[in-house]
Amino acid sequence: MSVAQTATSVDGDGNLRRTDVRNIAIIAHVDHGKTSLVDCLIRQSGVFRENQQMQTCLLDSNDLERERGITILAKNIAMMWNGVRINIIDTPGHADFGGEVERVLRMADGALLLVDAFEGPRPQTRFVLQKALQCGLALMVVINKIDRPDCRPDEVLSQTFDLLVELGADDKTLDFPYIYTSAREGYATHDPAQKGGDIRPLLDLVLEKIPGPIVRPDDPLQLMVTSLEWSRYVGRIATGRIAAGRIRTGQQVAVMRSNGAKTMAKVEQVQLYDNLGRSNTAEASA
């Protein structure tokens, strides 16, 4: 029996879904705590051993991003939680990078909408959130910075609901799960009056509320490429999501371009996102 067969189940609509994977995008306005939250998730999920040092602000690695405090090129981070691989996909937050936003969101099945417990939803949040709704992503709201003395989490939750109504969200989306966090203090809670603890309630809610990806493991290979890189050592690197079939080292594949042209290529190497980097694997499947 293949790994794909043992890690799938049929949902209520008859779709075959992976049960051991969650693909989530994080949507947030500048300074609402996205980088701090991801740092916290990585620390507490066991990516690093206790004696390891970790540079903060993991997602803001591009020089321009460090200078301006924004995210332009999305990064992917993978972590394991209770036997499930959680792929975290960071999203550009500005309308200027709309093409990048759409490509990134198509990698995800759900989105964490991160909102400051004092400021509430901001214009930057609105743009990416609208794109996420258009992609049909399952939504989960995270009200962050509840450790602030001036926080107003209940009002901000209501503002978030109103924003979703304005954007035309359906009834299912409006019944979104939500949780409160302090990324700086490292905890999540279902009750904003309850301070302290750890981030585990957030990770548990992700596994419970965000669906695994719909897959077709026995169909011919289909891989949606979302970004291309060039390495002087291995050549062109395509990053994307496998919707159907399998991809193996040494496999001959057809590369379909946007204009309909088709070229043949050989897969020299297959890698998966693994914690903060990538690891080689002989095969990957939908």
Language model: regions and residue ranges:
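P-loop NTPase switch module centered on the Walker A-proximal segment
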Residues: 2-115, 119-121, 159, 228-231
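Conserved nucleotide-binding/hydrolysis micro-motifs of P-loop NTPases
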Residues: 32, 44, 94-95, 118-121, ...
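Alpha-helical scaffold segments in soluble metabolic enzymes
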Residues: 36, 40, 103, 127, ...
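N-terminal, positively charged nucleic-acid-binding surface of large information/translation enzymes
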Residues: 63-78, 128, 134, 174-189
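Conserved catalytic-core segments of large NTP-driven translation/proteostasis enzymes
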Residues: 165-286
